[in-house]
Design a protein with these regions (language model features):
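Extended C-terminal regions of large enzymes
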Residues: 56, 77, 154-157, 161-164, ...
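Basic, polar low-complexity surface loops/patches
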Residues: 1-253, 298, 305
């Protein structure tokens, strides 16, 4: 038998309808499609018909890692989630990535990925423990936020367990629902949290004690060490060199096996402005334009705990609502006035900050689909524009959502002129786009291709 390096050799398949657990051979695909994204795209081609929608039981929720996952290679903690994505407008095959530690743990448990199909009769979660797999009842965690879900599953299975889960937004099939892992990382784009919810799948908990076999360990280790020395050098990115940036209450952190210190944790020991409980962690990927710093932090916590795509709310839904107010389509939600600037909104920076109370109300309504506004916005602005205000808000999407694809532009200027990636820096990305497996919406290489797609 040929020795396998990098891979474990098995992809887990869980049929929730039939309560059947099987595996398929990774190497059937790996030699031709290289990594988890390519393998999942091939499986989607074989198994997902054009008639399958995002919430159909026959949609596949594929969670994949690659041959480097679980090794010392920088960035090898990443995991990709793929399937027909409800956030896309219209729904189509897409993917979203997340960091953290869940991906390597899946590899250590003996699997190169998971294919989930069907729909459970009642809420369940999947428990993976060193190759042993069970489908267990989630009745006690259904309805919980993502943080409480992780805490509960760790109390059951042990503190060394890694968890991904959907929050109330996913359970309520919000098209902008995320899959959250622990406190700092999420598969934020695509709406895959709602795909979990549609399958009555609350979470996947995993623990593994295995390893990853490397063909030439010494050479590989030398390369990893060389890379680690180059990262923190004076010529490397500043984020790789600086750890603490604001004293004892804030600390930069990183995912497993990664040199980039791009996440942050904020410790707080004081009561929040409008939240009754205390919390410990701030998500640093996106920023809400809020009138107070504490409100901004609490909003990030709420979005992650509800399992909502905070990027979509901050950079898409709220600017669209402010544009709608400027065009006299709406003035308030539940008696709370929608803030909007006096001057026309041309760029994201022109938007008015919102109060913490307004944002907390909006996130709650989205997560639980409360009222006509909450129910519509739970699907994102592109879908909401078709339902609200007689469709008169659809033209206002043009500046925020390229081609109304369902996801707000990412990174390159956050819609409109003023992006910081220009010629010729995006040429390599254009070539990558030509052979990619997904749509050209947000976060396809940070949307640098948006400069040519128009």
């Amino acid at each position: 038998m040929t020795e396998i390096y990098g891979w474990t050799g098995k992809i887990l398949r869980v049929d929730l309808t039939r309560k059947k657990i099987t595996t398929i051979d990774t190497m059937k695909y790996a030699r031709m499609y290289i990594g988890g994204v390519g393998i999942a795209a091939r499986i989607a081609w074989e198994e997902i018909g054009p008639e399958v929608g995002p919430f159909d039981p026959e949609n596949r929720l594929m969670i994949m890692v690659g041959p480097l996952t679980g090794t010392l290679a920088s960035g090898s903690c990443r995991v990709e989630v793929l399937g027909v994505a409800p956030q896309q407008h219209p729904p189509r095959f897409s993917r979203s990535g997340m960091g953290g530690h869940w991906g390597p743990e899946l590899k250590y448990a003996g699997f190169d990925g998971i294919i989930i199909q069907g729909r459970a009769e009642k809420p369940v979660y999947i428990w993976i423990d060193d190759g042993d797999v069970e489908i267990l009842s989630a009745k006690d965690i259904w309805g919980l936020g993502t943080y409480a879900t992780t805490k509960t599953l760790r109390s059951i299975h042990g503190d060394d367990v890694r968890v991904i889960s959907c929050g109330p937004a996913g359970e309520n099939l919000c098209r902008i629902a995320i899959i959250q892992t622990e406190t700092e990382n999420a598969a934020g784009q695509g709406g895959f949290g709602a795909v979990m919810g549609s399958k009555n799948l609350k979470a996947i908990a995993v623990r593994g004690s295995g390893g990853v076999k490397v063909a030439r360990p010494k050479e590989f280790l030398d390369l990893c060490l060389k890379q680690s020395r180059e990262g923190p050098s004076p010529y490397g990115p500043k984020s790789l060199r600086e750890m603490d940036i604001s004293g004892p209450n804030f600390r930069r952190r990183k995912c497993g096996f990664c040199l980039s210190i791009c996440s942050g944790m904020l410790w707080m020991d004081v009561q929040g402005e409008f939240l009754p409980a205390l919390y410990t962690t701030e998500q640093m990927c996106y920023g809400f334009n809020v009138t107070s710093e504490r409100g901004k932090i609490e909003a990030r916590f709420l979005a992650s705990n509800y399992g909502i795509n905070g990027w979509e709310v901050s950079y898409g839904i709220i600017p669209w609502l402010q544009l709608c107010k400027q065009h006299d389509l709406i003035k308030e939600i539940d008696g709370m006035e929608i803030p909007a600037p006096d001057k026309p909104i041309r760029y994201l920076r022109d938007c008015a900050p919102v109060t913490p109370e307004f944002l907390a109300m909006l996130l709650h309504k989205i997560a639980y689909r409360e009222g006509p506004i909450g129910d519509a916005l739970a699907d994102g602005a592109c879908y909401a524009a078709e339902r609200l205000f007689g469709g008169r808000g659809k033209p206002l999407l043009d500046r925020i959502y390229p081609r109304h694809a369902g996801q707000v532009e990412h990174w390159a200027g956050h819609w409109g002129p003023g992006g910081n990636i220009y010629w010729p820096m995006w040429l390599t990305t254009v070539l990558q786009w030509c052979v990619d497996t997904r749509d050209p919406a947000s976060d396809t290489s940070h949307s640098w291709t948006s400069h040519v797609q128009r």
